[in-house]
C-alpha cells in the first residue's frame, strides 16, 4: 500500500471508532509477524502505555517501569518514539543517554544482568517502517497506540497499563 492508502485507512478507522475485535485481530497479526524471542524465565512485567493523552505529561509508562524495577520487578519495557504525544519511551530513554538499538543477544545479556530491558518497537516489528511516516504525519492517536501494550516481542506474565 502507499502512504495515502495507509493514511486514509487509519483516519477512517479513527473516525469510525476502533472495535475490540479490530484491536484483537491486529494484535494477533502483529505478534505473529514480530521478531519474537524468549528472555529470562518469562516471569516479568511490561509497562507499555498507549501514549497520545494530549495532556503533555511526562512519559508515565517509562517512569513506572523504573519504579517497579527499583522495587525488584523484572521489566521488559516495550515502547516507541512519540508519535501523538510529547515524549515516547524511546525519547525519554535516549534523552537520558541510553542506547535503545540493541540486538537480541545484547538485550538478553542486559536483562540477565540488571533485570530491566527496553525493547524498541521498530526493531522488533519490521513492518512498522511502512506506517511510521504516516503516523508521524497524522500526529494523533491511531490503532497502533492501542496495539503497543499487546505486542511486546517477548512473552511476559504481567502487563501494567499506566494511566494519566
Task: Indicate residue ranges for each PLM-predicted region.
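Acidic, glycine/proline-rich low-complexity segments that act as flexible tails and inter-domain linkers
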Residues: 1-56
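Phosphate/pyrophosphate-binding betaalpha-module
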Residues: 95-153
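Conserved small/polar residues in nucleotide/adenosyl-binding loops
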Residues: 157-163
Amino acid at each position: 500500500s502507499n502512504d495515502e492508502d495507509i493514511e486514509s485507512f487509519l483516519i477512517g478507522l479513527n473516525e469510525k471508532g476502533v472495535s475490540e475485535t479490530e484491536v484483537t485481530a491486529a494484535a494477533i497479526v502483529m505478534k505473529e509477524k514480530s521478531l519474537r524471542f524468549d528472555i529470562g524465565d518469562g516471569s516479568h512485567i511490561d509497562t507499555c502505555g498507549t501514549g497520545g493523552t494530549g495532556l503533555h505529561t511526562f512519559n508515565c509508562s517509562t517512569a513506572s517501569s523504573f519504579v517497579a524495577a527499583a522495587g525488584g520487578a523484572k521489566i521488559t519495557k516495550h515502547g516507541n518514539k512519540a508519535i501523538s504525544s510529547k515524549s515516547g519511551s524511546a525519547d525519554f530513554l535516549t534523552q537520558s543517554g541510553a542506547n535503545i538499538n540493541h540486538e537480541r543477544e545484547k538485550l538478553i545479556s542486559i536483562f540477565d544482568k540488571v533485570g530491566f530491558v527496553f525493547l524498541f518497537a521498530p526493531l522488533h516489528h519490521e513492518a512498522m517502517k511502512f506506517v511510521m511516516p504516516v503516523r508521524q504525519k497524522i500526529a494523533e492517536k491511531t490503532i497502533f497506540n492501542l496495539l503497543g501494550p499487546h505486542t511486546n516481542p517477548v512473552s511476559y506474565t504481567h502487563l501494567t497499563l499506566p494511566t494519566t
